């Protein structure tokens, strides 16, 4: 594997050993109805059942356990990150296990359920504007004030390696897999998965999926150069609003086979299908992968790519955004 990448497969193997005692081996589920709709065999890697409700605990815990001891003598005074919610929850949980204070920079537009969960795990929340620039500027200020260290949600190598452990599990759970479809925001998960897959079984395709309203990964692949979103994206898939970065881009450029973009309606439809047909309460970000497989663009993929594993990235749903939940009143005691 090219030395220019920020991680190697050895880092993923190390991450697996580092975190396996504290994360769930999440199940892979299937649906005959969704197979019929897609015209392929679909396997759903259910990271919504992971600790803190998303795949993010893998990278966060690997960073806390692996990065921090190598960085400072003893425990750091604090860890800091910026996150739309899931990485913030994961880092807070991981830091709490090690007795380290956590400060999470959260965009004001983040779902309320994710903000409440971060607070419930014991972190201090600091709000920012929804742009990448604002998040990073506020995080740097908090780092200076707390003398903490930054654990970037998707560009930190230890985080990327941790996310790559998903692929190790998939290859064991679905040995005949032909492709993985992964939602992409900052690219940490798809980069870690691509490093792992292309090392162990390079014939397996790795596809990224993202909202057309936040298509920086697609544009970057199209142009052959890193092309971040110019403005904060407007999408229901709040977990993939971040742009890919300097560490994830080279891996995506070289090892991700294609990028599929999907509309907001396609995301909503796919998410609802999973709710109704599989009885899995995924968040819209997790619906992006299925939306891609059901899209017209995906019909260009060879029919030989038959067994497809879709990563259901998380299940932290803001239930108050559903009209019937808003209308429901708590029963009297």
Curated annotation (Swiss-Prot):
Amino-acid positions noted as binding pyridoxal 5'-phosphate in the UniProt annotation, renumbered to this chain: 86, 154, 185-189, 313
Q: Name one GO cellular component term.
A: neuronal cell body
Mark the residues carrying the PTM S-nitrosocysteine: 113
Recorded source organism is: Rattus norvegicus
Q: What is this protein called?
A: Serine racemase
Binding-site positions, Mn(2+): 210, 214, 216
Q: Any one Gene Ontology biological process term?
A: response to ketamine
Q: EC number(s) in its UniProt entry?
A: 5.1.1.18, 4.3.1.18, 4.3.1.17
Where is Mg(2+) 4 bound in this sequence?
247
Q: Which family does it belong to?
A: Belongs to the serine/threonine dehydratase family.
**Which residues does Ca(2+) 2 bind?**
81
Name what induces it. Answer: Not induced further in the cerebellum or frontal cortex following two weeks of intraperitoneal injections of the antipsychotic haloperidol.
InterPro entries in the record: Ser/Thr_deHydtase_PyrdxlP-BS (IPR000634), TrpB-like_PALP (IPR001926), TrpB-like_PALP_sf (IPR036052)
- Assembly description: Homodimer.
Residues reported to bind Mg(2+) 3 = 210, 214, 216
Please give the CDD domains that the UniProt record associates with this protein. Thr-dehyd (cd01562)
Is the Protein biosynthesis keyword given for this protein?
no
Could you state what the record's PTM comment says about this protein? S-nitrosylated, leading to decrease the enzyme activity.
Q: Which residues bind ATP?
A: 31-33, 51-52, 89, 121, 279, 316
Give the positions the UniProt entry annotates as the active site. Answer: 56, 84
- Residues holding Mg(2+) 2: 178
């Amino acid at each position: 594997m090219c030395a220019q990448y920020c991680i190697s497969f050895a880092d993923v193997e190390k991450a697996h050993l580092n975190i396996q005692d504290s994360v769930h081996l999440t199940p892979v589920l299937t649906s005959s109805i969704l197979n019929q709709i897609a015209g392929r065999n679909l396997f759903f890697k259910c990271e919504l059942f992971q600790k803190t409700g998303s795949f993010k605990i893998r990278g966060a815990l690997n960073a806390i356990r692996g990065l921090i001891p190598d960085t400072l003598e003893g425990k750091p005074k604090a860890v800091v990150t910026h996150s739309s919610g899931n990485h913030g929850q994961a880092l807070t949980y991981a830091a709490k296990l090690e007795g380290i204070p956590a400060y999470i920079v959260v965009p004001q537009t983040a779902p309320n359920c994710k903000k409440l969960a971060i607070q419930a795990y014991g972190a201090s929340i600091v709000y920012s504007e929804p742009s990448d620039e604002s998040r990073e500027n506020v995080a740097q200020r908090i780092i200076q004030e707390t003398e903490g260290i930054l654990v970037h949600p998707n560009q930190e190598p230890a985080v990327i390696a941790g996310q790559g452990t998903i692929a190790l599990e998939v290859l064991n759970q679905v040995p005949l897999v032909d492709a993985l479809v992964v939602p992409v925001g900052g690219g940490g998960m798809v980069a870690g998965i691509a490093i792992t897959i292309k090392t162990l079984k390079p014939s397996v395709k790795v596809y990224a999926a993202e909202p057309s309203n936040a298509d920086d990964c697609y544009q970057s692949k199209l142009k052959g150069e890193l092309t971040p979103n110019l403005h904060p994206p407007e999408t229901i898939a709040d977990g993939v609003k971040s742009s890919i970065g300097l560490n994830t881009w080279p891996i995506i450029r070289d090892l991700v086979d294609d990028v599929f973009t999907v509309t907001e309606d396609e995301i909503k439809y796919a998410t609802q299908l999973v709710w109704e047909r599989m009885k899995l309460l995924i968040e819209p970000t997790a619906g992006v992968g299925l939306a891609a497989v059901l899209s017209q663009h995906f019909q260009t993929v060879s029919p030989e790519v038959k067994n497809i594993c879709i990563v259901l990235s998380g299940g932290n749903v803001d239930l108050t955004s559903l009209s019937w939940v808003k209308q429901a009143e708590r029963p009297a005691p």
